[in-house]
């Protein structure tokens, strides 16, 4: 079934307009040159982009800008890498890559679980999907047998309902938000594994593709068992050591983040008006959120019956936990997952909520309806701040509670747009998934929504958003954190916290990051290697370069050095950038301007904590110098 060591050597071309399903074979050198995963997806997207020029005639329903992302001809890719189908720890991954419906530029976003392994073991490096079906369909893959099945009866189903309805090893589906082209929609697998960023659920919906299911019986093929298994053994030994010494990550995953992030002034609070959990009104601190109560440690104390709920295959870390609640829980949830840090912050502290138990309902709503937790938190916090400032458009209000604008939930309850209201996130997301009234504007995401409000009311709503290139900021505030802003600004997808890291990410507060630029570029290329193999970022510490290289070479038969892999990764990083620049040229905007962070992060200082009084750079001159140095080292023109 596999044509080469380490690679099935083929992808499935799916034309939804015609119903055509074709095997497209890849040569071994192309596979090695692009590694796999993100690298292969980038290569295919940038060299085999099927987007018609007429796609630019489509206009975004809220902003009026060119909107080629949801045109039928725009391709949607789902790819695996050499580590899928292997025993390499923490390799339960797959990448979704397309033109983002949220930002209209390059997006790569990742899922955990078993889907990536099973797709590869079924005999496919990945999927290249284009066109649009006249009716709702689903793609069924059983090893090399592939078919399109009618899915009209599944229209309107949540992702949980889809997974229950389809008999397969793995199901990857959208909920009603994706069907409704909500620009922050996410496809979901295993009930809670989201391809979260960039609105790729709307990419599925625009193609009338409800789900992809995979069943596999195949086995992998490796070049050198001794080299490959030796690398796996070293990785497992390191992971075992970490567990034995009590590394809390192995028990709590990212959910301990609120405690650390608040101490370091990195945790978004009340729509990025603070970063320590402190709430301010008129310049005065009025409340301190309980970050311990918001953390996963409290979640476990409150739910002693909660258990480690398994892991992505195969992963010794097993960083998640779940709880099966009693009957009568809102939204009829069969099992509740412990939220990740990004969710605890964006649907917690960012909304003035400081209980991880309250955040669960919002998290589960995101998983059911298929929306991104980060962008959901950004959107809801924007609307709450609009209401707080008196900038809430009159035509949006469906009622008031004590003078605060409110909406009517699907159950008929009036819900106020106010910070600190734990009922707000799940019920607002339920309305967003099937948008009507004001929710048709909210469906565009926070940035598009702020632009609409500014255009229609004159209020400077765009100054209230935290983003780069239209992608909502993750739950790590860059102000006063040396080099963090540059990592967000130079990332091809927009603000993303998983594409770069520094050995000392905090450094000296409010000092220039100019000397960190070489390290930033190296780290970005390193992330391309990891995301092409594909390896979970949580395993990076247990997978040093020698282990990574030996695992890759042992699986594929290549003789690559880490330097070779960095050269390949650098090429892919630049290819994605060039693809973005070509888009910006078509719509008449300057690339350098697109790289800048939003107003809130460049102009609004933090009010307290170790970064009090600081913004994302020392000053505008420092920002410009850092960006120019980055362009120089990347070999980019200063205007691109």
Model-derived features with residue positions:
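Extended C-terminal regions of large enzymes
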Residues: 166-198, 204-640
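Basic, polar low-complexity surface loops/patches
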Residues: 1-292, 300-305, 368
């Amino acid at each position: 079934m596999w044509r080469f060591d380490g690679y099935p050597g083929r992808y499935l071309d799916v034309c939804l307009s015609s119903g055509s399903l074709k095997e497209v074979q890849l040569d071994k050198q192309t596979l090695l040159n692009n590694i796999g995963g993100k690298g292969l997806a980038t290569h295919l997207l940038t060299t085999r982009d099927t987007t018609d020029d007429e796609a630019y005639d489509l206009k975004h329903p809220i902003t009026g800008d060119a909107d080629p992302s949801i045109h039928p001809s725009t391709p949607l890719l789902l790819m695996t890498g050499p580590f899928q189908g292997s025993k390499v720890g923490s390799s339960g991954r797959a990448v979704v890559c397309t033109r983002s419906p949220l930002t209209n530029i390059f997006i790569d976003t990742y899922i955990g679980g078993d889907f990536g392994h099973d797709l590869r073991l079924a005999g496919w490096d990945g999927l290249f999907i284009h066109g649009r079906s006249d009716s709702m369909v689903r793609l069924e893959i059983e090893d090399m047998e592939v078919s399109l099945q009618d899915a009209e009866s599944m229209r309107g189903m949540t992702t949980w309902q889809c997974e229950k309805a389809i008999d397969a090893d793995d199901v990857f589906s959208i909920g009603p938000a994706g069907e409704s082209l909500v620009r922050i929609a996410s496809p979901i697998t295993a009930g809670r594994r989201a391809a979260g960023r960039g609105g790729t659920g709307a990419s599925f919906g625009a193609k009338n593709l409800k789900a992809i299911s995979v069943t596999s019986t195949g086995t992998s093929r490796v070049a050198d068992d001794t080299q490959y298994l030796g690398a796996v053994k070293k990785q497992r030994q390191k992971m075992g050591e970490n567990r034995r010494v009590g590394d809390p990550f192995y028990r709590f995953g990212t959910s301990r983040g609120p405690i650390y992030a608040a101490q370091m002034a990195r945790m978004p609070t009340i729509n990025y008006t603070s970063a320590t959990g402190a709430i301010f009104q008129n310049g005065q601190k009025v409340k301190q959120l309980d970050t311990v109560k918001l953390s996963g440690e409290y979640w476990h104390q409150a739910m002693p019956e909660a258990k480690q709920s398994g892991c992505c295959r195969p992963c010794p870390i097993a960083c998640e936990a779940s709880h099966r609640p009693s009957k009568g829980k809102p939204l009829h949830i069969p099992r509740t997952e412990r939220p990740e840090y990004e969710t605890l912050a964006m649907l917690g502290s960012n909304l003035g909520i400081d209980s991880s138990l309250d955040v669960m309902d919002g998290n589960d709503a995101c998983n059911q309806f298929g929306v991104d937790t980060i962008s959901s938190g950004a959107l809801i916090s924007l609307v709450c701040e609009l209401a707080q400032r008196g900038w809430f458009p009159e035509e949006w209000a469906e009622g008031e509670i004590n003078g605060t604008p409110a909406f009517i939930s699907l159950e008929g309850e009036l819900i106020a747009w106010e910070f600190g209201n734990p009922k707000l996130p799940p019920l607002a997301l339920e309305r967003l998934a099937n948008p009507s009234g004001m929710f048709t504007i909210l469906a565009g995401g926070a940035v598009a929504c702020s632009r609409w409000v500014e255009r229609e009311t004159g209020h400077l709503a765009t100054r209230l958003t935290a983003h780069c290139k239209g992608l909502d900021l993750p739950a790590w505030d860059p102000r006063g954190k040396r080099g963090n802003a540059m990592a967000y600004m130079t990332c091809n997808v927009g603000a993303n916290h998983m594409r770069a890291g520094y050995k000392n990410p905090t450094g000296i507060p409010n000092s220039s990051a100019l000397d960190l630029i070489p390290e930033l570029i190296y780290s970005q290329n390193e992330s391309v290697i990891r995301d092409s193999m594909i390896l979970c970022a949580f395993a990076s510490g247990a997978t040093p370069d020698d282990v990574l290289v030996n695992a890759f070479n042992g699986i594929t038969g290549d003789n690559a050095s880490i330097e070779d892999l960095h050269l390949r990764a650098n090429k892919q990083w630049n290819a994605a950038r060039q693809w973005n620049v070509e888009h910006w040229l078509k719509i008449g905007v300057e690339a350098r301007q697109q790289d800048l962070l939003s107003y809130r992060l460049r102009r609004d200082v933090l009010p307290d904590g170790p970064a009090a009084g600081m913004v994302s750079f020392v000053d505008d001159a420092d920002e410009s110098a850092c960006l120019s140095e980055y362009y120089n080292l990347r070999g980019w023109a200063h205007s691109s």
